[in-house]
């Protein structure tokens, strides 16, 4: 007997079936025989103990699990014959045992399906794509950054200023007790880089070489070591060295030395920097828009997620996490010690992130479906070429290492963002949006 049931609240198709009792009995007997072959009894060679005598030593749970494992592929095939195209099944199933004994087996398969999604009016979002207007100050700042990057650092004997690179020692205390990871010696820091928690670098300004001072800060709420979050801390610091940046001088000779194509004079450099700033502003606007638009849409829609999909995404995040630790040569135990996390804390974080990523992926997919956004072969080839150029690999290498489906999803998601920008941008940016839409750059 087979029964189908769609579960919209979990986006699953449940197929429940009662196994053929004769077949189940056969698999159970095979499992008994395999388990009996592992039994050792005095007077019998290993694997030669009669089943009648071996049964008393068998683990019933192990027999059931083995029988089910052997029978499962056939049962899954049987269940799959009851799936139709309109079910929109998107992944292999998980299963639950409804009833199981030596003579009977009832099992249900839960197939993840494309969820029912009712999107809000994504064509009229409160979030708008807005490009920051370029000012003369922006161009001057770009020039200054370039000159500083091409400049040199010299050691000075004066109080610390913004932009300096200092070498210093520090030791942190919470409730007047030293804490793990809060101490360092001969640490280099660019003042103004915001590498440390808020307020730390600002209090270093004005300090002098060889003199000690106390700095008071509060760890942020979302700090990576969660036991330190929102805690007040005191850092004892000592400046060892101060280096000041001596920027390069802006001349036509300097510009020519940069070897930028078609840029040989100061005026040409300014045009180049203006174009660069515009591209940066567009890219920054896209990133902000995507984040805020997805948040706005996500807050107005419920997306049911199948347990199997959540588990697969958690597994993927876990693999990436462990791969990153391995690359950085950090043992898991050491990471847990430093961060004060437990493995359950990490799993819980992965679960939250997995649900968020899956929800966003279905929002992308639903908009793509409604707007008829399908990648073309030309777009696929162009995307592969860009990846090859960016990574320094050949087109063939990219095609072999990055799956076709993954590239198609990336292109589709980009088309969705472009479409949302088309619907939700400020009037002042109409010309830039239209130009870049035509050039496929937004």
Swiss-Prot record:
Cell division found in the keyword field: yes
GO BP of this protein: cell division; protein folding; protein transport
Domain PPIase FKBP-type: 163-248
Localization (cell): Cytoplasm
Enzyme class: isomerase
Catalytic function, reaction form: [protein]-peptidylproline (omega=180) = [protein]-peptidylproline (omega=0)
GO terms for MF: peptidyl-prolyl cis-trans isomerase activity
InterPro entries listed in its UniProt record: PPIase_dom_sf, PPIase_FKBP_dom, Trig_fac, Trigger_fac_C, Trigger_fac_C_sf, Trigger_fac_ribosome-bd_bac, Trigger_fac_ribosome-bd_sf, Trigger_fact/SurA_dom_sf
E.C. code: 5.2.1.8
GO CC list: cytoplasm
Record's keyword terms, sorted: Cell cycle, Cell division, Chaperone, Cytoplasm, Isomerase, Rotamase
Family of the protein in this entry: Belongs to the FKBP-type PPIase family. Tig subfamily.
Function of the protein: Involved in protein export. Acts as a chaperone by maintaining the newly synthesized protein in an open conformation. Functions as a peptidyl-prolyl cis-trans isomerase.
Domain-related comment: Consists of 3 domains; the N-terminus binds the ribosome, the middle domain has PPIase activity, while the C-terminus has intrinsic chaperone activity on its own.
Protein name listed in UniProt: Trigger factor
